[in-house]
Amino acid sequence: MRGVGQLALHSTDPSRAAEFYESAFGFRRRAADDGGVDLELGGFELSFRRAERPARDGMQLGFRVDTAAEVDAWAQELSQRGFALLGPASGDRWEGTRSFRVSDPDGRQVAIFYHYPA
């Protein structure tokens, strides 16, 4: 096994959800039909399937970056492009992680994070 390659999520509006991830994080649309939308980024597939209501079970998606400075750069870029951050980028080497979060159109939290080496 090489790792996780695909995640499928419920969405009340798969096209709207896909547009958020395309615009915010650079995903590319692979396929779309009445039932949903498939996106891809770096070999990872993120799919949205139509549902009457999204599953709100505390799920959070996280995108790992290579440096703490990248966390700050992503936070600044998304904020400047009009995405509402749920709080400023926070955390340091002492805490072990630096991150920030935004909400997607279905209310899921999406984090950009960096883990400092131990």
Regions found by a protein language model. Name each.
Residues 1-15, 58-63, 116-118:
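N-terminal beta-strand motif that seeds the catalytic metal site of vicinal oxygen chelate
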Residues 2, 8-46:
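Core segments of cupin and vicinal oxygen chelate
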Residues 5, 34-35, 59, 96-98:
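Residue-level marker for the onset of beta-strands and adjacent loop->beta junctions
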Residues 76, 80-118:
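Vicinal oxygen chelate
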Residues 69-76:
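Short amphipathic alpha-helices within nucleic acid-binding modules
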